[in-house]
Each structure stands twice: as C-alpha cells, then as structure tokens.
Curated annotation (Swiss-Prot):
GO MF annotations in UniProt: ubiquitin protein ligase activity; zinc ion binding
Gene Ontology biological process terms in this record: innate immune response; negative regulation of cytoplasmic pattern recognition receptor signaling pathway; positive regulation of cGAS/STING signaling pathway; protein K63-linked ubiquitination; regulation of neuronal synaptic plasticity
Function in brief: Plays an inhibitory role in anti-RNA viral innate immunity by targeting the adapter DDX3X and promoting its 'Lys-48'-linked polyubiquitination. Alternatively, enhances the cGAS-STING pathway activation by promoting 'Lys-63'-linked ubiquitination of STING1, facilitating the STING1-TBK1 complex formation and STING1 activation.
Domain B30.2/SPRY positions: 142-352
Entry keyword set: Cytoplasm, Metal-binding, Transferase, Zinc, Zinc-finger
Alphabetical list of InterPro entries matching this protein: B30.2/SPRY, B30.2/SPRY_sf, Butyrophylin_SPRY, ConA-like_dom_sf, PRY, SPRY_dom, TRIM/RBCC, Znf-RING_euk
Tissues in which the UniProt entry reports expression: Expressed in the hippocampus. Expression is rapidly up-regulated in granule cells of the dentate gyrus after LTP induction.
Domain of life: Eukaryota
Enzyme superclass (EC): transferase
Cysteines paired by S-S bonds: none
Zinc finger (RING-type): 20-67
Protein name listed in UniProt: RING finger protein 39
Protein source organism: Rattus norvegicus
Amino acid sequence: MEVPELGPGLVERLEQLATCPLCGGPFEDPVLLACEHSFCRSCLARCWGSPAAPGSEEATPSCPCCGQPCPRRSLRSNVRLAVEVRISRGLREKLAEPGARTGRRRGGRIPTMGCLDPQGEDMRKTWRRFDVPVPKSSNSEEDLPEDYPVVKNMLHRLTADLTLDPRTAHRDLLISSDYRGVSLAPPGTPVPLDSPERFDRLRAVLGAQGFASGRHCWEVETAEGACFRDSLAKDEDAGESCYAVGAAGESVTRKGLIKLCPSEAIWAVEGRGGRLWALTAPEPTLLGGARPPPQRIRVDLDWERGRVAFYDGRSLDLLFAFQAPGPLGERVFPLLCTCDPRAPLRIVPGEA
C-alpha cells in the first residue's frame, strides 16, 4: 500500500477514526463492544444507564450504532484505539507547528516530518504506556519508519475490502472476474437478462456490500485523462461524460432515467471533459479548476453523520463533501458508473 503524503487530509481521516460516534469528540477511555463498534466509556455509560441491582433481571443493552445486543460483560478496553487517538492528536499538533513540512523518497509518498521524531518524550510515553514497541529513532527529516506499527495499522484501516454486485449492473457493463472492476462491454458480449435489481438506463453497478451504520472508506481507480463523447445514461446526451464514482442508497431508482444527485439517493463525483465535477443539484460543481481528475478517488462514508466525502486517493486532499441533515436513514452501497470501454473503473482491494 502506498502511504500518502502527510497533510491536513490525512490527519482529518485519522481523526475521523478516532472520533466517538456518540459525543462527536476524540475517544476518551474507549471500549469495544461485541459488535466491534467503539465508544467512550463514559458516553456508553450515559447511553445505557446504570446496571440493574444485584439479583434483579436486566434486559441486554444494545449497540447505539447497529442495535445488536451487547452484554455489559462483553465490554473490553480498546487499547489500540487509545494509542491511535494519541497519535492523531500528536499529528495535528505537529502539523500546526511552524516549519512542519513533508518530503518524498524512493518514489513513494510517505509521512516525513522530522518533528514527528519518535525520540520525542511524549510519543515515547504513549508507546510505552500501551506496551507498543517504540519505533527506531531518526534525527533527520526522513520517512516515518517502516516499523511504525500503529500508524501503518491506522492507514490500512482506511479502506474496506469491497466487491461489485453483478446482479445490479447495467446490461451494457462487464464485471471483471474478481468482481472489483467494471467497464463498458465490447460489441458481441452476451447480454444478461434484466431483473428488478438491475439498472436499465443508468450504466451503473452497486457494491455487493452495503452499510447501515459506522464509517467506511473505499478507493476507486479511474482512467485518468480520459474524455469520451458518450453518456452515463443510455440514450441521453450528457456531453463528454466518462465515469461517476460515489455511493447510492438502497432505495435508488433502478429503472428509467435518473438524475445523479442527493435527492435521488446518489452522492457522486463525475469525470467529464477532463475535469472532475461534484454531482450537486441543480447544477454540478466543478472541482479542482483546470486540474485533471485524480487517478484514484477515495470515498468516505460516515453514515451516522450523513456525510459522504471524496478525497484524492494519493494526497488525501479533500475534493468535496456532501452533508445530509442527519443519518442517511438506509443502507448505502458503493456506486460506479462508466460509459466507454476505454474508461474502466476498479475498486482498490482494501488492506486490513
């Protein structure tokens, strides 16, 4: 996995991982439930209330995020998450210091701030407190050490391992054998039968995995610089449309023409005319000025906060964010659209 250059976008993503879904602030004494959701211990205590008196029966409390029953005795201290909270705070503080900068080495872009030297006493205390091996020291502005285990783990957690659902794919689309790639099928390709799940006008496919709670992220590789005179929607001229990447609610219309916008349960960006556009309503929003679309687009879904954000997958610079007034209210799936055999899209395998 290529580690992105350290910057505000990366720190923001790390902070999102270190944020309690109940209070919206950094985790304090985080605990892990049986369903794998984490909360501040005090936040969960307020949510669940006091335990029943000894000898009396108590209904099993449920997870505030997913609703799964989670006995109190199943709570565990999330030590690794506590370490990550400390690290994300440290990165934010150090990034704000005068003279903080990043660098590059060996063609890869890796966090390279000398002020993140793990010889720093505060950082050493953090690692030792949680019984994590202290990384090798470095006195120069070199790369973050390769054996920096918790930071690497945090970065690996930033992407989910997803596949595409061929049952939803428009009949003009071809899904790769590993169910991660999609392209417009060449002439002569056998056409599958129509079904209620399948898009019949929008050349789109949904992910096989949907989300009804939590924070999730996936990356999509695009055909950078491609610019084609075709349409995302069959028989509809949308100009030089090439592809769209984003997320769609389970209720998204599968039949007929669809306007790609949040009111239709679609949050997406579109590569068109050599530019990247956020598919807002009533008109799309141009992103990045004259710069070409990135080769890799990262989609961040924060279900409870109603936020779908898009980042440059290499630099982690924020491209655009859709914000709903509250939780998204339904299961949300990855969405990929493409309209030309020269413009394939591919979900990048997640690393865990």
